[in-house]
Amino acid sequence: MNRPTPNFEAIDKKISAFVTNHDNLLDKLLKQQTELLTSEITTNFEVTQQIQEEVAKKTKQHSKNYKWLVTVVLANGVVSLFLLGGLIYLFSK
């Protein structure tokens, strides 16, 4: 069972002919891939930036709500102390 040896020179010629015929195709594919990756990175950056802006707005709103809540609780505490002091003064006589 002798197998014939492949003709490597003919194979090399066919490969080089294919590569020279399809150089433009490879360049186009590389350019498309580069453009696709660039647009994907840009889109991801824009989405990330939008999410950061939304989180910043919500954080600012929570901060305002927290300050309002602290003010109300402190005012309630002051009023309660005055009322309690008034009751103690009233019943201590």
Swiss-Prot record:
What name does the UniProt record give this protein? Answer: Uncharacterized protein MPN_272
Specify the species.
Answer: Mycoplasma pneumoniae (strain ATCC 29342 / M129 / Subtype 1) (Mycoplasmoides pneumoniae)
Q: What GO cellular component entries does it have?
A: membrane
Q: What is the lineage of its organism?
A: Bacteria, Bacillati, Mycoplasmatota, Mycoplasmoidales, Mycoplasmoidaceae
| Locations listed in the record | Membrane
Q: List the transmembrane segments.
A: 68-88
Q: How does it sit in the membrane?
A: Single-pass membrane protein
This protein's major location comes to membrane
Sorted alphabetically, the keyword list is:
Membrane, Transmembrane, Transmembrane helix
